[in-house]
Amino acid sequence: FLRLYWIPIICLGLLACNRDQDASLEPTTEIIKLNPDTMHDHRILEQNALRNAYFGDLHVHSNNSLDAYSLAGVRASTDDAYRFARGEAIDHPFGYKIRLKGEALDFYAVSDHAEFFGVVKSLADPAGPLRDHPLAALIQSPDKADNRKGFVALESELTRGEPIDPPLGSEAVLRSAWQENINIANKNYEPGKFTTFIAYEYSSHPQNANLHRVVLFPGDDGPLRPFGSQDSLNPEDLWDWLDALRSDGLDSIAIPHNSNWSQGLMFQRVTMDGGPVTPAYAKQRLRNEPIVEITQIKGTSETHPLLSPEDEWSDFELWFKNRGKVDEEGRRIRDEDGNVVEFDGATTGAYARDALLAGMELEEAVGTNMYQFGFIGSTDGHNAASPFEEDEYFGKLGTNDGSPELRGSVPTDEKLPSIFSDTLDWSASGLAGVWAEQNTRESIFQALKRKEIFATSGPRIRVRFFGGYDYPDDLDRAPDSIEKAYAKGVPMGGELLAEGNRVPHFFLSASRDPSGGFLQRAQIVKGWINEGKSHEQIFDVACSDNLVP
């Protein structure tokens, strides 16, 4: 099953906070520069001007992440994660081996949480600099309950949006772990064969609203340390920091994810403090966040039945927190008017398709569209691995869902942990697809920025979409169809400008995963604004099984 969303327009955002704090703990825009002799040379690599499809995962956690180490028992490292992506077997926290069933991935980013980056691993080290901290005993304990207490104590520090006091907020520990992360990413980068990205996750969750972003850097260099929620809970401050790095020569993108649990805050029609969106604000957001992760283990963030009632697949892999309340027999609870009683979070501002329309509405008001973004999928796997293969699913969070019993796949008499209600509903998903000239950091990063990208829930389906005014009727049958599509139009992610009353033509190409099932249909979801109100309509453009679009 494949669907495409065509909205020909643009938009974006800004803000900041001042804090009186120790200068050593302030966010820094200093950049770590590599020795030029160790940098990668791509001049000898072949390029395909018509671009190749590459698949990867830009959202993976290793033992540097607070929750992976203390809550899930994950000991697999950043280096192990890259080994997994290349097709090697690594250890699951439950002791068995995990590896990809299908082909190796083309690109990968280990994006550990900025908050307490490497700190828990240091607490667990009997010879480490934090070995005498009171929480070290909880983290080092063989009792999982103690580990969880340590996790809860650390996580509680992150809701304040304030610098963490030493020694837990040790800049030395953070910078050392971050520098190691950069070194390992660069060591595993093999231009033309396997691309790694320096990355981390900004993990702001004010009042339990998910405002997380993966931050991705394009080259061999990275900042001195990552900017996290301990620096600010406000993502607008993150954009300011990224802009400052950009002015010093270090580009980046931030990728929002799990907007489905943002309580409607991810894609608001106002600023974070409730102010009006201005053109400058909109441009800043678009500059820093040109793409969005719309599918992963914790469900889809594409759309919701309440937002797309005419879409029969709008409930695809919804997280249970977004599906609506159910009774003891699993039936949706409805109010006296017959409406589904929703959980918090299933709201306007929480889904990407709704945001595309909101951006068009904002453009009419302020002249700029801050939600003209592209889509990717990734996993958010916390085992230093990517569980996107449905028939080889090994869970997301180590010892919390690493067995069939813990995922509810087989019956058990054992008492299940409180997180069990979450693990029941997690999905094997997803992947990022890009169209790029070559498998290098530069080429893939540019594909991400121009949004010639797509999301899948795991299968390696190859999707292309073009728009233009001069496409011949037989373009789909032409042997040089892709070349003509580029020459006479614009690819997915681009802008097709209106030309009077001329009617555009669209060219869609999709091919199945060679190891997966056949495609059932291709759809285009059209969104538009009429008299200040947004609308969407779904079109079947190609069907199998003798169905007629």
Give the residues covered by each predicted segment.
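Conserved, charged catalytic cores of large soluble enzymes
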Residues: 221, 231-233
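Bacterial N-terminal signal peptides that target proteins for export
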Residues: 1-6
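Long, charge-dense tracts
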Residues: 216-218
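Acidic, metal/ion-coordinating pockets
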Residues: 229, 237
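C-terminal functional module detector
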Residues: 18-78, 82-85, 89-141, 167-170, ...
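Low-complexity, serine/threonine/proline-enriched polar segments
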Residues: 135-162, 549
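C-terminal motif of bacterial Sec signal peptides marking the signal peptidase cleavage site
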Residues: 14-16
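Active-site gating/metal-coordination segments in enzymes
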Residues: 221-226, 294
